[in-house]
Amino acid sequence: MNWDDTTDATADERLVGASADREDQAVEAALRPKDLDEFIGQEKVREQLDLVLRAARARGATSDHVLLSGAPGLGKTTLSMIIAAEMGAPIRITSGPAIQHAGDLAAILSSLQEGEVLFLDEIHRMSRPAEEMLYMAMEDFRVDVIVGKGPGATAIPLELPPFTLVGATTRAGLLPPPLRDRFGFTAHMEFYEPHELERVIHRSAGLLDVEIDSRGAAEIAGRSRGTPRIANRLLRRVRDYAQVKADGVITREIAAAALKVYEVDARGLDRLDRGVLEALLKLFGGGPVGLSTLAVAVGEERETVEEVAEPFLVREGLLARTPRGRVATPAAWAHLGLTPPPRATGGNGQGDLFGA
C-alpha cells in the first residue's frame, strides 16, 4: 500500500465519517421521519420519550427539558424535531459554538414563543457565561440581563415563556453537573444493529425511489458502522453505481462492487482505517507502538489517527490502547489476512520512545 494515499483522508472527506456534510444535510431533510412511529431503532429511548411527551400533552404543559447524548449520525437532531412535532410546537435550532456570549443566548431566549422547542446542538461547547445563564432559564424561565459595565452595571430580570430545551452532545462527560441535573429526561443514543440499519436503508430507498433487495440492504448495513447517516450515504453512492454500471437495482453483488470502488470493506473500514492497521501490523509487528510513531508511519497528524481512525478500530476490537502504546488484536491480523509473528501476543512487547 502507498502510505501517501491516506494523507488526504480527513474526517470531513471520508465516506464513512459520521459528521454531516452539505449533501447529507439536504438529503436528511427529505428522509427524516416525522414522528416517533416512523423513527427506527433506539427502542428504549423511543418508549421512554413517548411517555414523557404523552404525559406533557395530557397535562397541557411543556415537556421536560431533554438531553440526548451519543455519537454523531444516530438521530439526535431528528429526535429533537420529532419532539417539537409531537408537542405541536415550533422549533428553533442553534449550536453551542454559536453561543459564545451570554447576550447571544439572551437574545435567543427572549424571542422564544410559549411552548417552543429550542434545540441546542453540541451543548458542551457553549461558553461558560452562557451556560450559567441557561441554568436560571431552564429552572425558573427567566434570565438576568446585565445592563452597563463596571460598578454601575445593573441586572434586569427578564421573564421567559415556558419552553423546552433539547440539548445534544457527543461528549456528555464535559457537561457540568449543574447543567446535566436540570434536564428532566436524559437519553443515550446507542449504535444501531445491522437489522435496524437494514430497515433504515429500505425506508430511505423507498423515499429515494431506489430499488434494492434484502441482500443488497444487508450488504450496505454491514459496512455502515452502526450509524444511520453513514448507511444513507453509502446507499446513495451504491445507487449511483447501480445506475451507471448496472440496471439500477441494488443487489448484494452490486453493493459489494460499488463499495469496493469506494474502498469501504466488509467491516466498514476505509483507506485510513486500513492504513493504520497495516502500519501497525506490517511495520511494527502488531505493537505496542506509540501514537506519534504510528501517525508518522501512516502519514497523518497524530490527532487524525487518535480522533478519526482509532475510535472505530477500538470499538470493532481491532486495536487496543495500552499504557505502552497501540496494539493490534488477533481480529486485526485475521481481518487483513495476515499471520501474526510468534511474539505478537497482544501487548507484551516493548513500547517505543514516543509513548502512547
Curated annotation (Swiss-Prot):
Location of the region described as Head domain (RuvB-H) in the Swiss-Prot/TrEMBL record: 266-356
Residue sites binding ATP per the record: L31, R32, G73, K76, T77, T78, E139, D140, F141, R182, Y192, R229
Top-level taxon in the UniProt lineage: Bacteria
Compartment annotation: Cytoplasm
Stored SMART domains: AAA (SM00382)
Pfam families named in the record: AAA_lid_4 (PF17864), RuvB_C (PF05491), RuvB_N (PF05496)
Catalytic activity: ATP + H2O = ADP + phosphate + H(+)
Name the record gives this protein: Holliday junction branch migration complex subunit RuvB
Organism, scientific name: Streptomyces avermitilis (strain ATCC 31267 / DSM 46492 / JCM 5070 / NBRC 14893 / NCIMB 12804 / NRRL 8165 / MA-4680)
